[in-house]
Amino acid sequence: MLKHICLLSVVIFFAACRDKGKGDLLDEMASREINEPYEPIFLQDTAVASLEKVTIKDKYYRTAIEREVVNFYKKYNYQTRWLYQNKPSPLFASYIKTLTELTDYGFFPQNYRQHELDSLVGHLYQHKDSLFLKQLETTDREITASFLLLTRHLTQGRIPKVGDDVRVWKRNKPIFDNVELLLKLKDTDNLSTVIEALQPQQAFYKAMAQKYKELLKDTTSYTPFAITDLKSFAVGYSDSTVVALRNQLGLRGYKPVAQGAPAEVDSLLIEAVKQFQRQVGLTADGAPGALTMSYLQMTPKQQSDLLLLNMERLRWQNKDLGEDYILVNIPEYRLNLYHKDSLKFTTKIVVGKPDTPTPIFSDSLKYVEFRPTWSVPISIVRREMIPRIVDSGDSLKYAKRGYKLYENNKEIDPATINWRDEKTLRRNLAFVEDPSENNSLGLVKFVLHNDMSIYLHDTPSKKLFDNTQRTYSHGCVRVQYPDSLAYQLLKHTAEWNYQKVNDAMQTGRDQYRVHPK
């Protein structure tokens, strides 16, 4: 059963049950008592001003981390956590090791002062003097600040803001208490395992991390070029750039063996281009145009940077997605439904225009509604519909298309409105489109709980799915095969089979809402 939805810059998720592997570890830690240090050293200086004096290499989180450091030592009875009288705790060594391992996930140890802290601790125990305890306290606080910053980055992301439009990026609220986590950690805990549990647990996140690790070692060089005469690119076309195209496809794992001269285009080469286009989400037309070539010639560094950004976005929406979820890849314009990380259904989508982008957030599925009406958002009424009525001079422009006009919940005749009056733009006018196959939302919509009126829906504009770039909506996600999606969502609900879904769309009652079980 699908419950939760998570919209990301790259993906949208619909999730169900929690990931038990991740949840069991964190739940077990949450149930613990506060860890008692093996060799407690009580802080000599417990003033808030002193505890807040830590180095944090992140301006955005600095104030929050300072507060967390103070909170931690207060709850920990003002004792050192990482450093004991005669040696560092095993947890410190584990932390230094873990920071190195996190480079495989695109984290940079220097941001958490790995070498600096390791050196400070080593020097501290080798050169004990009258200031030893004071320096030990200070260093312990610095390690705590480093750890709390890392856990922030793991669970909330490292990029504080992308773009100026708050509609585009809406993160999850934190689901982990980083201070409580540190309070419950034992010296015997495998910190690498704990840190792993804090990261997204989806198979595609782990696959991204594995690919990122491989790309860091990839030294392949790609020489930029373009097909000399793209319009003539077809079987029989001959040019030296065709040889270069074969070579670059070979570097990507495709082996278009020439049927004749290597410089001549043949059917196998065109098929290899199509296969590559399908892999990266482009229209598989076999023509190596500018967009196809930009993907084909992407360097390992460019690929790793893109993966790093996508992994970061997944961390922003770090949720347990469970066994059943839907991933909507916005740049690829595709929706994928998974069960236990196995792809079960896929379809094309249309997403928001550049000026009305599909926002990024996590949510849950509320219900499926068949034969919906469309209550046009007031922003669209004022910005688009009224100006079009004025330009056309036809007061009934939208009435002819099945829209009814309301003001203060009372239906009114659009012919009675002076659409050219500037005051009309300030009136509380509402257009509502009746259910039909021509309704802007089509015959079914998938309603979420968010406060932005963003949902998935059918569309009468089916031809848009033939385009490679599909950014045409006002922010909602249009689905090419909504009937199949509805079936996938409702098939575990009593009596809902594909035929019943089709009947509900074509001949069922209007605004029929079904809550998935």
Regions found by a protein language model. Name each.
Residues 10-11, 359:
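Proline-rich low-complexity regions
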Residues 99-102, 150-155, 185-186, 249-252, ...:
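Generic structural signal for hydrophobic core residues of well-folded globular domains
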Residues 18-76, 148, 165-168, 189-517:
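Well-ordered beta-sheet/strand-loop patches within structured domains
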